[in-house]
Swiss-Prot record:
UniProt keyword annotations, A-Z: Disulfide bond, Knottin, Secreted, Signal, Toxin
Listed PROSITE patterns: SPIDER_CSTX (PS60029)
Signal peptide span: 1-19
Name of this chain's protein: U1-lycotoxin-Ls1z
Similarity annotation: Belongs to the neurotoxin 19 (CSTX) family. 03 subfamily.
Molecular function GO terms recorded: toxin activity
Compartments where located: Secreted
Disulfide pairings: C43-C58, C50-C67, C57-C85, C69-C83
Propeptide boundaries: 20-40
Keyword Secreted annotated: yes
Keyword Amino-acid biosynthesis belongs to the record: no
Length: 106
């Protein structure tokens, strides 16, 4: 059990460090991102529809939300695709481990 917790914590830390791409940007890239601040403010919040913009989801506490799509069948039998911004299961598990670690280690 301890090994599983340690492995999960390591995976979480690696995933978190790889998702923090802004920290690794050079100064020029950071300035261009700051110029596009308006675009970043218009990201799609969690649980909102992202069918037309699948890469526009906002960031959560640790990770960026992902656009998750499902096929919806209407009463008339038509199949349509419905997408929403949400947290993938493996990110939920990582956030749970990090939260648990923060409670234990302060």
């Amino acid at each position: 059990m301890k090994v599983l917790v340690v492995v999960a914590l390591l995976v979480t830390l690696i995933s978190y460090s790889s998702s923090e791409g802004i920290d690794d940007l050079e100064a020029d890239e950071l300035l261009s991102l700051m110029a596009n601040e308006q675009t970043r403010k218009e990201c799609i919040p969690k649980h909102h529809e992202c069918t037309s913009n699948k890469h526009g989801c906002c960031r959560g506490h640790l990770f960026k939300y992902k656009c998750q799509c499902t096929t919806v069948v209407t009463q008339s039998g038509e199949e349509t695709e419905g997408c929403f911004c949400g947290t993938p299961p493996h990110h939920k598990a990582a956030e749970l481990v990090v939260g648990f670690g923060k409670k234990i280690f302060g």
